[in-house]
Structures are given as C-alpha cells and as structure tokens.
Amino acid sequence: MGETQRGQERSRKKRIVTAGLVLAMAVSFAGLGYVVFRKLSPGGYRDYTVQKEQYYVEYSEEYDYGEVITVEYPVLTGIDSVIQEQMNAQLYETAMDRVNYWHFHPSKAVKAFQAHQFTIFCSDVTSDVTYHSQYLLSVDFYELYSAGNPVWNTNITERGFNADLLTGEIYELTDILEINREFMDLWGACYCEQTGEEAWDEEELTLLLSWFLQEDEELKAVYESRPFFYVTENKEFVVGLSLDPVLYGAITYEPTSRILSTVVKPQELAPFKTGSEFWDRYEKSRAAGEVLPCEDKVKNIWLGEGAGIWNYF
C-alpha cells in the first residue's frame, strides 16, 4: 500500500472515530436533556405512580393494652428523589397522625389518660387520592379510632394533604384562601344546601369562624380544631374541619363524627383566593400519574366495614 493510500485510510478512520464520538456525545446530551427536561420542565410530571400501602398490627403484646391498627397510606415514585423522599415522609406522618398522638408518641397527659382508660387502642385509616395532576397531589385521609374502653368509644376524623410535586410545598387551607366572615357565609350556605339543614345564624357562623382560625380558647381545652381541604377529581374543593378530642372527649360510648365539611365550587372561591402559587398550578393542572390500590389490604377486625363495633349499633 502506498503512502498516499495509507494516508487516505488513516484520514478515513479518523473521520469515522470523530463522527462516532460526536454521535455518542449527541446521544448522551440528548439523554441528559431529557432527564433535565423531565425533572425541571414547567410541564410537570406525567408518568409518576402513587402506590397505596398499609401499616398493620394486631395485638402485638408490646403494650399494657391491646392494639389493632390498619393505616393505609400513599407512596409516591417517579419525581425528584429529594422531594419524593420528603413528601412520602409527610404522607406517612399525616396518615399516622392520631396513631402517633394516642399510641406511638403520647404526651404525659395522654399517658395518664391511657393508664386510666386504655384496655385497647384501634385505628383504621383509609387514604383516597382524590386529585393527581402534573403539578399537584391531593389526598383525603379518613379515620376511625377507639381510644379507651370499651372499643366502641370510637371517634371519626378526617384530614387533607395537598402538595406541589415540583417544589414539595404543602398547602394548608389558610395558604390558599382568606378565611374571614364573608367566607363563612359562603361555606355555611354550601353546607346547608348540601345537607338540607337550616341556615346557620350569625352567632353560629362567628363561632365557626373561630374554629376555622383556631382561635376558640374554650374549645382548645377539649378539642383541637383542624381545618382541612382537598381537591376532587372534578377540580371542586372539599373544605371543612374536624374536632379531634384532646383527652376525655374521646370517650363517646358510640361511633361519633365531629367532621364539618362541604363541597365548594372553584368559581365561588374566587373572592377569597390568596396569592399562593397553588392557584397557578391548579389552573394549569390536568390529570396525570397513576394510583394503584393497596395489595393484600387487611380489614380492621374492630373498625372495618361490617366488623366488631358495628354489631353493637
């Protein structure tokens, strides 16, 4: 092979190697660009998954009283790993809220209550992922729990969880709405229309406002007022509060709900919107992600549908 031919061959190989490197770099940057776009794009997340799981224990014999606990909670995958870990921890804590209060992490006052009242603690929590878009996740936690003896000292409570998938921000009711006297007029009208109850009078609405703002000092001695909201699949809002017993209010002698909630249409909330980024996310939201049911979900033997306590009522 002559020098000229060998030179041409080397030149051809060099061009092939160079082209290969350029192609590899292009593919690499394209992949990186896809990942960055997927993580940071204003379009949000579309392919994430919410898998429901369950914490379950039945008479572990680790305590001076029996326990039957079935807590369903969502586990999120497919978004930024840091935000995902943070959000999953918050979802779990929200699901376990009353279990932590009465059972796992009791205060001194609750421990004293346990010593006099507990022969059993039961909790049954269901989680309903009511809305999931490329930006927002909204969950309704509904719980029955028995704190004391007999087991039909059952309280029914509810709480909402609303989060920004891009930033991890958790939205409370007062983050997105101005809760004032005019808002209570709207809320009261919606509540009475949907329940068929008589209209709330001025005194009742003023008292209710103090509950939503958590300003009723007399109430705090017996119940903790806990406002909540969540978004429905139709992008309407369920707005309400639950009165959770501090101590002896938990003695009910029958299943008792202290939940006050109603559906409010988004257009009716317009005068009360805050400047929260939630509203921009909400307006641009479209359904996204997938919710998977809890596998091998266990029914609570005392509080589940058709279970123990319902035999007494």
Kindly give the residue locations of the regions a language model identified.
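Compositionally biased intrinsically disordered regions enriched in Thr/Gly
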Residues: 2-22, 33-313
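Hydrophobic core
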Residues: 25-29
